[in-house]
Amino acid sequence: MRVSSLTVGGYGKEVSWQAVQRASLIRIINPALPHILHDRPALARLHWAAEVTGIGLAASIKPQLTDIMIRKTACSAVALLVLIGATPAFATNGMNLEGYGAKSMAMGGTGSAYDTGNSAVMNNPATLGFMKEGTSEIGFGIRGLHPDISLDNNGITDKSDATVLHALDVLHAPRRTDHLGRRMLAQGAWAPTTATTRRCSLR
């Protein structure tokens, strides 16, 4: 915050800040308003300058806000509002897992365009095309879901804090062009999933 002008009024006279500087009555160059208000020597010199010129001090300091200060203030206000409004949800969606299988979980949920084994059927069944011809794969998976859930509705109460999710899959690639597989997984309930892919090659 820079001070653009200082008006010293009294007896019908006004002296601008630049005029006071030119008269060498006060030597404060490009002062900041908080600095002036808290700087006792500067205020004393200001009173002295007013007394020397015979002008009563009416203390009218006019600050000039710069665009940078306005932007900083606005950004700070917006950031404060965002922080106040952002509250944790403490929610979970266990049925929409971030990854299926150990490989997918270790790779941050990968499975749409990368073969992570039998579990990739859930993300993209086309990854069965990466299996070698004449091979079969059997997989078993287990995973824990641990939300803290309680219910109290019309006299019915229930509580749950742990659920075990099982997965069983069998995949077989009989020929180079056909890949068949069947996977059973716990998606809220046992839900068998069948996937068939056909690989086409251009010659």
From Swiss-Prot:
Protein name: Uncharacterized protein in phosphoenolpyruvate carboxykinase gene 5'region
Species of the source: Chlorobium limicola
